Amino acid sequence: GHAGKVTWAIEQGAVGGVPLTGFAFGCASNADAFMPSPSQFTYFQGGGFDVSFLSFLEVDRQGNVNVSKLGKKPYLTAGCGGFVDITANARKIVFAGLFEAAATLVLSADGLKVEKPGKFSKMVDEVEHVTFSGRRARETGQDVLYVTERCVMRITDDGLVATEINDSARFVALRV
């Protein structure tokens, strides 16, 4: 594993330790230090880190990402938060999330399987709101990956290209 080789930095100020999820999102267990949030953002804005790991609401064929607006349920998002600061100067970005919202996955000896398809695809023709620009990422030379349970995609001059496909995950239709 990579334990001891990774130091997590969270926008709320925690450095090191293990990031917490759910209601405790933004906190960390056994953090090495706590920075004032403005200092943490100065660090992020300066690109002082190797890789950013973030999630997404929607991704489109050009690599644009929406994390800040979900028209049908605007109460589910609180805006972009520190997302723009974290992605603007990152040399490498890994977006990770489910290919379909609310899909049920099962991990077995045979691999990862989609037990129940999601309610809707998070891979869309055009995102509702551009919080991260795929075009800007290409222009600035950022290395961007999109990781889902079904495939890994990389941003290219032609848009998203699947570079790895999970053979055990049942595909409905990959229209990216």
Short names for language-model regions:
Residues G16-V176:
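Conserved phosphate- and dinucleotide-binding cores of soluble alpha/beta proteins
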Residues K5-T7, D50-V51:
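Beta-sheet entry/capping signal
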Residues G1:
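Active-site pocket-lining segments that scaffold enzyme catalytic pockets across diverse folds
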